[in-house]
Every structure is written in C-alpha cells, then in structure tokens.
C-alpha cells in the first residue's frame, strides 16, 4: 500500500522549520528545526527512508512530495496546521492543540513517553526523573532520555520541556541554544 507524505517549509524567528504531514489521516508525522532548506529536506528524506525500511515487510511504501501537489481542500487543512504549529513555536498556544500526531516510528514505550510529554504545559518544565515517575517507572530515566532523543515531532511533542534533575538544560537534538530559546519564549526559565 502506498502512502503520501507532504512537506512544507516555514520560517520563524527561532528556527527554520520543515513539517511532514500525512494527508490521508490529516496527521503531523515529522518536524525538523534549524538549518537550511536542503538540510531540513535531507532530514525528512532520511526519516522517510527509515520508515520505508521498517514498513516494507508490511507492504507499505511512503512517498515524500512537496505541498504543491495538494488539492485545495488539503491545502486549507495544511495551512491551518502550519499556522497552529507556528503558534505553538511562538508560545502563543499550548502543544495540546488539535494538531493530530501519527507516529510512523517508535516502540510502544517511546510512544507512551511522547504522549505523556505532550501533557506538559507551556511555561512548565519537569525532569527526566519526574517524567519517569509520571510513567510509573522511576528507574527508566535513561530509557526516557533515549525515547525523547528519538522524538520526530519537535515542539508539538515538547521534549524541550524536559530538563536535568538539577535544572540543567540537557539533551536536545536541535541544540541546547534552541532549547533554551524555546523555554524562554514559553517563560519557563
């Protein structure tokens, strides 16, 4: 079965952004931050390649296309999703919006970590240890850090709100400087 994925570029004061959506389910499946358009698109292509390598046994193939191929109904939906995403990035609305996420990669544990992370409101931070307790597994701190490092839907899954136990900003795929900027914008630090 063939699945269409569509990408769009956005610009924001904090970072250049590329989002990838699945129009058939109206879901956000991937976000990359910072870098040039070619780098961001390269990140998306690597993501789709990994999804395809894990999905081919199931008979699924994902194809990545520019948003220009969309029909007008889908363009309106994508424009709304893009607007909502930029509002989250700007700290204007919380990540618990009507942006539907679909995880094309990830174990059940990772997906549980990501869903729990989505509940952390803008302006708040918690430690990896606190997140482990929320998940009912206080000893899973390293596993949680690993799961967050594999988060493919930055900002909407707000892994930037997870900090070290002593309040130190640690681990963010797109850089500690961007993590700090996001938290300052949300008035969390």
Curated annotation (Swiss-Prot):
Its EC number is 2.1.1.63. This enzyme catalyzes only one turnover and therefore is not strictly catalytic. According to one definition, an enzyme is a biocatalyst that acts repeatedly and over many reaction cycles. PROSITE patterns: MGMT. The keyword DNA damage applies. Pfam families: DNA_binding_1. One of its GO terms (biological process) is methylation. Keywords: DNA damage, DNA repair, DNA-binding, Methyltransferase, Nucleus, Transferase. Belongs to the MGMT family. SUPFAM superfamilies: Methylated DNA-protein cysteine methyltransferase, C-terminal domain. It comes from Kluyveromyces lactis (strain ATCC 8585 / CBS 2359 / DSM 70799 / NBRC 1267 / NRRL Y-1140 / WM37). CDD domains: ATase (cd06445). InterPro entries: MethylDNA_cys_MeTrfase_AS (IPR001497), MethylDNA_cys_MeTrfase_DNA-bd (IPR014048), MethylDNA_cys_MeTrfase_DNAb (IPR036217), WH-like_DNA-bd_sf (IPR036388). GO terms for molecular function: DNA binding; methylated-DNA-[protein]-cysteine S-methyltransferase activity. The active site is at residue 159. It catalyses: a 6-O-methyl-2'-deoxyguanosine in DNA + L-cysteinyl-[protein] = S-methyl-L-cysteinyl-[protein] + a 2'-deoxyguanosine in DNA; a 4-O-methyl-thymidine in DNA + L-cysteinyl-[protein] = a thymidine in DNA + S-methyl-L-cysteinyl-[protein]. DNA binds at residues 128, 142, 165. This is Methylated-DNA--protein-cysteine methyltransferase.
């Amino acid at each position: 079965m063939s699945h269409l994925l569509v990408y769009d570029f956005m610009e924001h004061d904090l970072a250049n952004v590329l989002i990838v959506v699945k129009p058939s389910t109206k879901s956000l499946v991937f976000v990359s931050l910072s870098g040039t358009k070619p780098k961001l698109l390269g990140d998306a292509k690597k993501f789709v390649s990994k999804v395809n390598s894990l999905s081919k046994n199931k008979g699924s193939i994902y194809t990545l296309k520019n948003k220009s191929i969309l029909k007008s109904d889908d363009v309106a939906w994508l424009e709304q999703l893009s607007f909502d995403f930029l509002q989250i990035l700007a700290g204007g609305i919380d990540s618990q919006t009507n942006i539907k996420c679909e995880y094309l990669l990830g174990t059940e544990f990772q997906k549980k970590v990501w869903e729990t992370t989505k509940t952390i409101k803008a302006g708040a931070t918690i430690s990896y240890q606190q997140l482990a307790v929320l998940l009912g597994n206080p000893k899973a701190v390293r596993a949680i850090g690993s799961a967050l490092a594999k988060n493919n839907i930055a900002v909407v899954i707000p892994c930037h709100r997870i900090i070290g136990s002593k309040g130190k900003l640690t681990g963010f795929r797109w850089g500690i400087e961007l993590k700090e900027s996001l938290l300052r914008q949300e008035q969390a630090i």
